[in-house]
């Protein structure tokens, strides 16, 4: 594989690491786009914090012409958290035959939440012979670590996991998606009420592309795909997280009042035909001073095994996972291919 050329889509917090990691990994940045007028027209070095690179950030409206001009091997997309918000960008990549990998949490396994968009991206990507996928922190810490642990287990009855992270680290879109800053009444109306529906109503929302999955919704689908399990039911419940003191959020540029939602806990429970239950929880909130990231999973069966990761550098791990997956994306079959079908996430340093 020769020198990999990439385009960065989204030049916010996450791109600081994805661009630097990719460049340090021997890749060449040939373009970048964003919607923020404060960075458009500037060299990407102003975001990365390095010497001038010679690549100017353009408006995202120029993405199509940029891809046609520079013909990158891959686009790194670090913008939004839901497929509805990314459909246009990913479709632009697919139509141009450009491989794309995104930190979008729903993109980790979108077939179980946005089947129409996933199917259409899959169709176009196959026509143009490119691959679209999602990766990030969950690829390792909610995915491959768990399936590896399962591989060391004789009999499994349940897989249970919980992961927490600071929404401040991921930008305004993610913070708002978690209900951070809302009153409890607003949270109940705008976030929690969406899950007080029947299975039939949820399936209708999914079919119509109107379902808003929590991050573990797609993770459970990924785990089932990787482990060869057949989901027969899946539900989710979102509850607000609060704090007893005011907390300032730099991402939201506001003070979250004591008792208001600092974020949410989302629990997804999946029952499978094989009799294995997967119950996973993600807690995303504006952290107080004493909070820290944690990741804890247990595989129940023979034997029971638990692993705990305390204070993982979630942002850096997310971005390194994206960059380390790029060779897999380039060599994968065409279409929308989740990383559950790409083999294990591994350390990959490319020659200069």
What does each model-found stretch correspond to?
Residues 1-96:
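N-terminal glycine-/serine-/threonine-rich beta1-alpha1-beta2 phosphate-ribose binding loop
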Residues 9, 13, 151-285, 312, ...:
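Active-site-lining helix/loop region of Rossmann-like oxidoreductase modules
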Residues 12-14, 82-83, 107-112, 136-143, ...:
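Gly/Ser/Thr-rich loops at beta-strand to alpha-helix junctions
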Residues 19-20, 122, 143-150, 217-225, ...:
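Predominant activation on well-ordered alpha-helical scaffold segments within soluble catalytic domains
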Residues 86, 105-130:
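Rossmann-fold NAD(P)-binding glycine/threonine-rich loop
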Residues 128-156, 311, 319:
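Adenosine-phosphate binding glycine-rich loop
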Residues 285-352:
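C-terminal helical cap and adjacent loop that interface with cofactors, partners, or active-site loops
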